[in-house]
Amino acid sequence: MLCRNSHANDMKRNFYGFNLLGMFCRTKMENGDRRIFGHFPEDRFQWMREWGFNFARLPLDYRFFVEKDDWMKPVESQLVKLDEAVSHGRRHGIHVQINFHRAPGYCCNPPVEPKSLFLDPEPLAAFTNLWSLLAKRYRGIPNGELSFDLLNEPAPVAPYGATPEGYARVARAALAAIRAADPDRFVMSDGWKWGQLPVMELHPFDSLSGESIHCYEPHRVTHYKVHNPDEPGPCPPWPPEGCVDGVEWLERNFVEKWCPAIEDGTFLHLGEFGCHQVNVPHATYLAWLEDVLKMCRRHGWGWALWNLDGTFGILDTPRTDCEFEDFHGHKLDRKALDLLRKYKT
């Protein structure tokens, strides 16, 4: 599809920032996760702008926005909170990207959805209805200020029965619903297998769409002791043993998977990357972080750190092996922030 307004190519410049988890998971919020506020505080947008960033990805849980017993019935009072986030972004010069981290019938994290987005008609109807609603709601906002990212990390997670072909079918249905309401909206699609591989079934992408990459490689470093707290041995080093250049390791083990998308000119953005802060030594984390940022600079990719607040972020992380700076009553990892600022251009 050719661009049809002056804003259509605004996404072709790079965006750098953070994932904001304000409405990320209703279950976690109800269980006391302090990263999930049930809304998006304006101060986060203000701070990002003060630091020089221009992008916020909002991974959402659909359960905030529809009635529990009727997925087709939106909850206006909750949608207003999303309106506020979009307004915060526009006010502070932060591009907002809306993403469904949990969609009707799919999430890569527990709890399991009662039906499958890829196999059952009801979740697909609810999913496309949500995107149609948001496309109508935000029609007219320039692509430089707002974009959509369809579904977080499609993957062969049991029991949903997802395949690349099945995901492509769902993505096309959602894209059609969006374009019917707002033909010029820029739309991203996450890569297959948790954002690790291009979905070639969706290629070639048109000028109003692109693919979102997620980098948590090597997983044994970024998620050290996350899934197995009793994992023996120290955190693996970075760069890996036998490798003197971490960027080259990432090129061989991560970027090469994306060569088909790079070669066909697809717009790519690193929508998630990060490292769990609890057990990974700070020096290891900073070395890994800088190499991922160098990789992105080499390829001209924008990026969004997972996340701003909490276990993967730079505010109020649970680590105990670094000096924190007091920042408006929060613990700020200044060294990590300085690295991010260094590589945001």
Predicted segments with their positions:
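An active-site-proximal structural segment forming one wall of the substrate-binding cleft
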Residues: 36-56, 71-102, 106-147, 170-181
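Aromatic-rich peripheral "rim/lid" segments of glycoside hydrolase catalytic domains that contact
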Residues: 281-345
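Short, solvent-exposed turn/loop segments enriched in Gly/Ser/Thr/Pro and often Arg
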Residues: 21, 59-62, 100-106, 191-193, ...
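Acidic-and-aromatic substrate-binding clefts and catalytic sites of carbohydrate-active enzymes
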Residues: 34-39, 64-66, 72-76, 155-158, ...
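Surface-exposed, active-site-proximal loop segments in enzymatic domains
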Residues: 26-34, 62-79, 104-122, 156-159, ...
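N-terminal carbohydrate-binding accessory modules
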Residues: 1-57, 91, 260
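Acidic/histidine-rich helix-loop elements
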Residues: 20-40, 68-73, 116-119, 220-250, ...
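Active-site region of glycoside hydrolase catalytic domains
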Residues: 3-8, 12-14, 110, 118-247, ...
